[in-house]
Amino acid sequence: MSETVEGPTVGEPAVAGSAVDEAAITRLVEHVVREFIDHSPANSLGGEIQEPAFCDPLVGYASGADSMFEELKEAVGPGHWTPAEAFAAGTGQQVPPEELTVISWVLASTPATKADNRKEDRFPAERWARNRIFGQQGNDELHRLLCQALSEAGVEAVAPSLLPQWQEKRDPDRFMVTSWSERHVAHVAGLGTFGLCDGLITPRGKAVRLGSIVAHAVLPPTPRPYQSHTEYCLFYSRGICGACVKRCPVGSVSTTGRDKLRCAMHLNPGTREYVEREYGFAGYGCGLCQTGVPCESRIPATRDGKSAAGGGAG
């Protein structure tokens, strides 16, 4: 995964001849993400709280031919797109998967947002609810900014989660299935593993929002520094913790699984009614299982200083 870096200067070509300049494209992507975080008015909690929604981004890359994308048809659902299917849905072009790269990113919630939500025990803090609604609107804008920047550099890209064909629907076995799961895509791109409450634990923790695009370019993939899809979770990897179980206000998280219906009912109508009544805007959210837990802001560490991934706490 990559810390965001300085990008190309204005007018600097991102392509060398007919071949994509991998380094220039990578710099461009990470520059656009950093510019969004530092300067975009879309990175905002909205309303009277004129603060950024996000900080500390990370970017990861995965080959469109990575076999794990096919495995997501089992893990998420048979309707989950491969990168080639997503690119075809957005462009009408049939492109070999090895010619595509999935670019995924992590946007960390701000310390103030996390601190506020840490204090709650039933409903979301206002900053958290604003992050969920207005922050996600900004994240959607980042998808568009990246696609536009790549297009101007001669690289076609699509944002699967913004395509009109994208669906989220009920499933008798999995409760809800989607055409493109940002959590699972980020996992493939080396950005994190899953926790007991199903959130993705990243180097920026679990109190994050995620996004991704599919680009018609071959970029170096990010190594996956884990062996299993739950490696960073202290409960799954060490048999300890379970803090998110205690944080869930409706008992939807347990050591034997997650009651997704109970969680969904708490979100809507439960938190929606609360947010509209108390904060005065149409929104919802919870995130209690993502805050006030060891994996809130990092890959968690045990008392002996060892991380769930097996190394030092960092």
Positions of PLM-derived features:
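Non-catalytic, usually N-terminal nucleic-acid engagement modules in DNA/RNA processing proteins
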Residues: 2-7, 11-132
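Catalytic cores of enzyme domains
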Residues: 120-314
